[in-house]
């Protein structure tokens, strides 16, 4: 009787591994549906890097449009008081800088 339950348990484990596409991970890298986990991680990292680049482009395009809409030109900023020449940066997400204010009181005591 114990042999029958043991055999059924082994068959159940083998069936579940087959259904989910997971190869045995003993002594070798795990695979999910035929792909190495390392390859999957590298693809995700590349996708995240590409998304960050796209977000950076969108942010700077938006900032440029806002500056042009407000008719703020370089000569106006140059002629302004020294405190108005400062451009302050903040981080929306780590690694993505964005201009938030021109000529603010940030940093003044």
Swiss-Prot record:
Signal peptide residue numbers: 1-21
Keywords: Amidation, Antibiotic, Antimicrobial, Immunity, Innate immunity, Membrane, Secreted, Signal, Target cell membrane, Target membrane
Keyword Membrane carried by entry: yes
Chain positions found as Isoleucine amide: 106
Subcellular location: Secreted; Target cell membrane
Residue ranges of the propeptide: 22-77
Assigned GO CC terms: extracellular region
Tissue specificity of this protein: Expressed in the ectodermal epithelium.
Superkingdom of the source species: Eukaryota
Family: Belongs to the arminin family.
Described purpose of this protein according to its UniProt entry: Antimicrobial peptide with a broad-spectrum antimicrobial activity. Keeps its antibacterial activity under a wide range of salt concentrations that mimic physiological conditions of human blood, which is surprising, since Hydra is an obligate freshwater animal with nearly no salt tolerance. Does not affect red blood cells.
Protein name per the record: Arminin 6560
The species this protein was found in: Hydra vulgaris
High-level lineage: Eukaryota, Metazoa, Cnidaria, Hydrozoa, Hydroidolina
